[in-house]
Each structure stands twice: as structure tokens, then as C-alpha cells.
């Protein structure tokens, strides 16, 4: 079974609502329950932050963690669970810095994990499928930086 590395950073996808405030509290193991049968997962709980509060140093730490995960040749790809407020910026930084041809897929959620409309599980499943269905011949960018965002069926 392929190994997929999952880096958790917080965000709405890892949040529950307490007294009207969304707080990131869920670790990777909790978030991957619905997809546990799809792959072997290596979970790295890097940080637990609201992505609106991320600084450049946090984004750099995420990109560095991706690079470290690719140090293992057995890793099929990396999924980053991230908040939507700064996902674009962090994924762009990773795109600029990653040279490995294996996939990096960012995903998150619009609704907290305890909301009946929670989209996190579907987005995680999409991210896992994106990594597992990756074809280096068809999908790889020869210049490196194979970063994608998987969200809402896209």
C-alpha cells in the first residue's frame, strides 16, 4: 500500500466551534478516519493555527516539512491540511521551493468538523485520490513544483 504523508497545520478543517469561535483542535489521526483504508498514512502534526495568523516563518516551516517528507523515497506524495485564509500563499511558496516531482496537495474546509455541512472529509478524500492517481508522465511539471489545491470536487 502506498505511503502518503499528511502534514497538519490547523485551519477550519481541524476546527470545532466553541462558544461561536472556530478553534483548531483536531489532529491528523482524527481527520483521516474516513480515508484510513485508502492508503498508509504518515502523519506529521506540524502546527495547530488559524491560517489567518500564519506568518512567513510558519509558511516556510510548512514548505520545509514537505521537503523533509520527500527525503523518504517511499512517500508517494504529501498532503497539507491547511486553513483557507492563507492556503494560496503557502501553496505558492511551496510551488516555488519544491523541486521533487512527486505531488503536493493542499486542502482545507469551509465548515468546521462539527458543522453538519462539513466539507473537510470530502476534501481530504479528494486530496488522497489526487495523490494516489498521480501520473508522473501526465501530471509532472518538468520544472518541478508539482503543487495542487484539491477543494470542492476540483
Annotate each predicted stretch with a short phrase:
Residues 1-154:
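Active-site histidine-anchored catalytic micro-motif
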Amino acid at each position: 500500500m502506498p505511503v502518503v504523508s499528511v502534514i497538519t497545520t490547523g485551519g477550519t478543517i481541524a476546527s470545532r466551534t466553541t462558544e461561536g469561535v472556530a478553534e483548531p483542535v483536531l489532529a491528523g489521526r482524527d481527520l483521516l478516519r474516513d480515508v484510513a483504508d485508502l492508503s498508509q498514512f504518515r502523519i506529521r502534526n506540524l502546527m495547530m493555527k488559524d491560517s489567518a495568523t500564519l506568518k512567513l516563518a510558519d509558511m516556510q516551516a510548512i514548505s520545509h516539512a514537505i521537503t523533509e517528507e520527500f527525503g523518504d523515497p517511499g512517500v508517494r506524495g504529501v498532503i497539507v491540511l491547511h486553513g483557507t485564509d492563507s492556503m494560496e500563499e503557502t501553496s505558492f511558496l511551496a510551488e516555488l521551493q519544491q523541486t521533487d516531482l512527486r505531488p503536493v496537495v493542499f486542502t482545507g474546509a469551509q465548515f468546521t468538523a462539527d458543522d453538519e455541512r462539513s466539507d473537510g472529509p470530502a476534501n481530504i478524500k479528494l486530496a488522497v485520490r489526487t495523490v494516489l492517481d498521480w501520473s508522473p508522465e501526465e501530471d509532472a511539471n518538468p520544472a518541478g513544483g508539482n503543487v495542487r489545491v484539491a477543494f470542492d470536487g476540483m
